[in-house]
A protein has these predicted regions:
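Terminal amphipathic helices with adjacent charged low-complexity linkers/tails
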Residues: 274, 308-415, 454, 599-600, ...
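Ferredoxin-type iron-sulfur electron-transfer modules in oxidoreductases and energy-metabolism complexes
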Residues: 548-581, 585-723, 841-847, 885, ...
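A gly/ser-rich beta-alpha-beta helix-loop segment of oxidoreductase catalytic cores
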Residues: 90-95, 135-179, 184, 229, ...
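A glycine-rich phosphate-binding loop feature that marks nucleotide/adenosyl-phosphate handling sites
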Residues: 88-90, 148-155, 240-247, 314-331, ...
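Flexible inter-domain linker/hinge segments
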Residues: 2-4, 204-248, 254, 524, ...
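N-terminal flexible segment immediately upstream of the FAD-binding catalytic core
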Residues: 1-72, 86-118, 147, 170, ...
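N-terminal glycine-rich flavin-associated loop
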Residues: 46-77, 81, 99, 103-148, ...
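Iron-sulfur cluster-binding electron-transfer modules in prokaryotic oxidoreductases
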Residues: 529, 536, 690-1018
Length: 1018
């Protein structure tokens, strides 16, 4: 039995008082002080961890202004505040103690657009890709690019002055900010835009906080203008935080306070709104993927690409390429970046040409390719091959792979992981290759492995050395390397921070700004935030306050992680290896990961949030001398005893009375998970939440009783076959209002599915497929076996959607094969989901033994439901290891291509069919949609894939009362629009859960693709 974790870091009474006053005065947002909520805000995409006291989620600028006014009261003067966006920062920019002000949950509205003038006004929490999705119908996009664009907020981009691919042409975020609305400490509203210097002087003479800000920034930047121009490097990725250089335009005729706020990392004000310049979408885009024999060759050849008038040049090294090959993303780009025969591709330049003149762009591409051919013929520059990508879809797939590279590095094997701390250095592009030679020599001298990729056209290369942050010596080495890289960038006239902001690296600011300009930064900080209450420790302290700065060697996540025993860390690697890349925060509702995060917009209900909580839970267990691995081993031996039942009943009673246990907070986060397993493939680190969730639930319920519904769900494969003996009788009772009410109130289940009537057994009565024993099959000749197909049953289609199984048997027959319906053998998926892992292990072993015996017959085994079939490949392997055996159960679309003759039918024409894939299937088997389309094409029919996220049912998740509202809301995110837009009779759905959800919500059912094939065949 796990112990009660009764203590968690407390919250200061002053903080609680502040939050209470805030709510009393009309604050409309949310506040959070639970340990779980605070932990999810203690990390970002960096190596640092810093626990805040509370989190505030404002809904509007008015909420932020109220917050700032209340904070200005003398009794709350000691409280500090840090604005936070998407939490994707790589250097702890938004990590701090005190109170975190999260702009991402509610302040995500696009306020207005003026397409004629080319600008848009947004709130700070709008996500970059969300904005571009909105702008696309207008023919515009927001140009600054970054790899985390599907979860990074515009407020975060502005605060770090982010940039990425294409910056040589498009510049940084600050180049596209026309004006800002910000809230100052004290509650004053500051609106900024470029103004004539005369007006700036007038504003500076106003006797107000805003007036003092204008006056100070104007006077200090004007007085130091010559030094600023001399000191700031002449780089595309110019020095920001604070951007003294661009406050005035080159002619000194305009003054723009906006440029001080861009890159300020929340140290000056709360940025709540922005007016942004938007760019026309290019009509033509082409990519040339140039392959090299070494990474150095790719680097040294990059200037040649820029001279060819390319929009951008992105470079990827062999380490990143090889990690991409091992990821699901490679399936989407493998034909666009093929290997060169007899050559090893160790570097890649992704060269983009874009514009509105197709003839001009094609000529530029042709000229470049001709020159590349000449280099290859002469064996020069290390070029070994090239490919051109002409279509937009292919361009976007390649960039998706490149964007995922940053996360893929975290999936490197071993305890040492490539980490960010010197990953956005910038030097003049003409010096980049020589700089990288020295950088690599530095890392090689310490025996470190590393991955490299980046924007070579702008002189920025992302370098992530692999270090084990659980090793104190390697933590020291990180600081040593940082110091060396600072000196190296200075040697080449570059910057340590080319695009990701300073964060905990602010200690190096004096070295880059110089003593005089650093003093000016402090004066500017002082006029905005004289008491050092906004994200203190970042960029600089205000003049007059000698507060310490955050440092590179500050407390890191590894400080806490190393308190967990190595064996436990290794066993729970799914939770331990999450690096915070945040892909699970993807805003796109059509992306399968993560439905609970999408519907709640709460970080504790994301894979990252759940991994964070489990790590802390493991640490707290270790702190109490408890080894969860040993507890797991002991559980099967202990069995169920009266003593254990009494103890768990007592613990439940105390829990209902409000007794604190951190395990309850972890349980709450786990309960929101749909166990769809999208994270296990979509996450670059392959964080498998359902796997460690099941383990947690098993241990949690060693202390606390399970609800009745968990036992009912886990036992479905025991009672469903019995109920199917009399389906109409049981359906009669299931439909009774009193039973529905009883189920909802006392069991916590709603909309219970009806059994198939007639049952599968009744439908197959007398059919030869159901009358063959295993012994009869073993006695068949090889010739007879060649035409046999063994149908593996699952509990959901066989007992609740039997027509699908019956139709598959008919389809097999129509194709000239003899189907055999194998006896039902429990799969155990429901047991695994609910954390009955001891029972699941027994179920899995029994079924694996049966299927291994059947597999020896040499006949194909085929199952219908993706989630259940994939359980044989995933959960069985995790649980049984080598004892699983090597049986293979195919899905319908995997078997059909092998069964089809070479004679394809002519195109039938007519309306297409529309495929809705099960999210587990779509993410685990990315080729499935194309395979289904090819199968339909073989029969002369057209099948189009419908891009949707999760349907919201996920087995029994959608039937549980506590999940009902979220289940419907998840369906509404993407499925509902698609289902109502397309003809229902042409919509085909592979997953049983998904078909159930459609029928429940839309009132009419949909078919499995195999049923449409049966209709087509006639």
């Amino acid at each position: 039995m796990i112990p009660q974790i009764s203590q968690a870091p407390g919250v200061l009474q002053l903080v609680l008082n502040f939050l209470q006053v805030l709510e009393q005065q009309g604050f409309t947002g949310d506040t959070a002080t639970s340990y779980a909520d605070r932990l999810t805000m203690a990390t970002d995409n960096s190596v640092y961890q810093l626990l805040p006291d509370a989190v505030i989620f404002p809904r509007s600028t008015a909420d932020v202004a109220l917050l700032a006014r209340v904070a200005a009261e003398p009794r709350f003067k000691s409280l500090i505040f840090t604005p936070r966006g998407g939490g994707t920062g790589t250097n702890g920019q938004a990590l701090n103690g005190g109170i975190i002000v999260d702009m991402s949950r509610y302040m995500n509205r696009i306020i207005e657009i003026n397409p004629d003038e080319g600008w848009v006004r947004v709130e700070a929490g709008v996500i970059k890709d969300q904005l571009n999705q909105f702008l696309k119908p207008y023919g515009y996009f927001f140009a600054p690019e970054l790899s985390t664009s599907n979860r990074a907020t515009l407020g975060g981009m502005i605060n770090t002055d982010a940039s990425g691919q294409g910056s040589l042409v498009y510049g940084k975020t600050s180049d596209h900010v026309l004006g800002l609305r910000a809230v100052l400490m004290g509650g004053d509203i500051l609106d900024t835009q470029a103004v004539p210097v005369a007006l700036a002087e007038t504003l500076g003479n106003t006797p107000s906080t805003v007036g003092r800000i204008y006056n100070t920034v104007y006077q200090r930047c004007k007085a130091q203008r010559d030094l600023i121009i001399d000191k700031f490097p002449k780089l595309n990725r110019f020095l920001t935080g604070y951007d003294l250089r661009h406050v005035f335009n080159d002619e000194m005729s305009e003054f723009d306070l906006t440029r001080i706020l861009t890159g300020s990392e929340g140290t000056l004000a709360f940025i709540t709104e922005a007016r942004l310049d938007i760019t026309r979408l290019p009509k033509v885009r082409r990519l040339v993927n140039v392959k090299y024999d070494s990474f150095d060759s790719a680097l040294r050849n990059a200037p040649f690409m820029v001279e060819a008038k390319a929009l951008s040049v992105e470079t990827v090294d062999s380490k990143v390429l090889n990690l991409a090959r091992e990821d699901i993303v490679w399936h989407s780009v493998s034909e666009l970046i093929t290997d060169v025969p007899d050559k090893e591709m160790l570097g890649l330049n992704i060269v983009e040409f874009a514009g509105d003149d197709a003839a001009l762009i094609d000529q530029q591409v042709t000229t470049l390719c001709q020159r590349l051919d000449e280099l290859m013929a002469a064996s020069e520059a290390g070029v070994i091959g090239w490919q051109v990508c002409h279509d937009l879809e292919g361009v976007e797939r390649i960039y998706a792979m490149r964007k995922k590279a940053v996360g893929l590095l975290g999936n490197a094997k071993g305890a040492a992981k490539p980490i960010p701390f010197a990953e956005d250095t910038c030097v003049p592009p003409e010096h980049l290759a020589d700089y990288i030679v020295e950088f690599r020599a530095l890392l090689d001298s310490h025996g470190l492995s590393y991955g490299m990729f980046g924007h070579v056209d702008a002189g920025v290369l992302h370098v992530r050395p692999a270090l084990d942050m659980c090793d104190p010596q390697q933590e020291v080495l990180m600081k040593q390397i940082s110091d060396d890289v600072v000196a190296l960038t200075a040697k080449y006239g570059g910057l340590l921070w080319g695009e990701h902001g300073k964060g905990f690296r602010a200690e190096y600011s004096p070295a880059f700004f110089g003593e005089t300009l650093y003093a000016e930064l402090r004066k500017i900080k002082a006029v905005f935030d004289p008491d050092n209450r906004l994200n203190p420790g970042k960029i600089c302290p205000p003049e007059g306050i000698d507060a310490p700065m955050m440092k590179v060697d500050a407390a890191k996540r590894g400080t806490w992680d190393r308190q967990i025993p190595i064996a436990v860390r290794s066993s729970w690697r799914g939770a331990m290896e999450c690096n915070g890349n945040g892909l699970c925060f993807n805003f796109d509702v059509k992306s399968p990961m993560c439905p609970s995060m999408k519907v709640s917009n709460q970080r504790i209900h994301s894979p990252k949030g759940r991994a964070t909580l489990v790590r802390e839970w493991l640490r707290l267990l270790a702190d109490r001398g408890v080894d969860p691995n040993q507890l797991e081993k002991a559980l099967p031996e202990q069995g169920v005893s009266l003593r254990s039942l009494v103890a768990r009943t007592r613990n439940n009673w105390h829990a209902r009375k409000g007794e604190y246990d951190f395990s309850h907070e972890v349980k709450e986060a786990m309960s929101g998970c749909l166990a769809c397993k999208a994270c296990s493939t979509q996450c670059p680190i392959k964080i498998d939440v359902p796997e460690f969730r099941s383990r947690f639930l098993q241990l949690y319920h060693s202390r606390y009783l399970r609800p009745v519904r968990d036992h009912l769900v886990a036992s479905v494969e025991s009672y469903a076959p019995l109920m199917a003996q009399a389906p109409k009788t049981f359906n009669f009772f299931i439909n009774q209002p009193w039973l529905k009410k009883l189920s909802e109130k006392h069991i916590g289940m709603v909309d219970l599915p009806l059994l198939s009537a007639p049952s599968l057994k009744q439908q197959m009565a007398g059919h030869r497929s159901a009358n063959m024993t295993l012994e009869q099959l073993e006695a068949l000749s090889a010739e007879q076996k060649a035409k046999m197909v063994l149908v593996v049953q699952d509990p959901f289609t066989s007992y609740y959607d039997a027509q699908v199984v019956a139709d598959f048997i008919r389809l097999v027959e129509a194709l000239g094969y003899q189907p055999v319906l194998l006896p039902f053998s429990p799969n155990g998926k429901a047991q695994h989901i609910k954390g009955f892992l001891t029972r699941f292990a027994r179920t899995a072993q029994k079924t694996a033994d049966f299927l291994n015996r059947v597999a020896q017959l040499g006949m194909p085994l085929v199952g219908v439901d993706p989630a259940l079939v994939l359980c044989y490949r995933d959960e069985y392997k995790q649980t049984l290891g080598d004892k699983r055996g090597d049986f293979q159960v195919l899905l319908v679309h995997e078997w059909l291509p092998k069964a089809l003759t070479s004679d394809a039918r002519p195109d039938l024409g007519g309306e297409p069919w529309y495929l809705f894939g099960h999210c587990t299937e779509v993410t685990a088997l990315p080729a499935a949609t194309k395979q289904w389309a090819d199968i339909f094409a073989h029969f002369g029919a057209k099948l189009e894939n419908v891009s949707v996220g999760c349907c919201g049912m996920a087995g029994t998740y959608g039937h549980e009362v506590k999940n009902h509202a979220n289940s419907l809301a998840i369906y509404a995110l993407s499925w509902q629009q698609a289902m109502q837009r397309l003809p229902r009779n042409r919509c085909l759905v592979t997953g049983y859960s998904c078909r159930s959800q459609v029928k429940r919500i839309e009132g009419s059912g949909v078919r499995h693709p195999l049923q449409a094939l049966l209709e087509i065949i006639g």
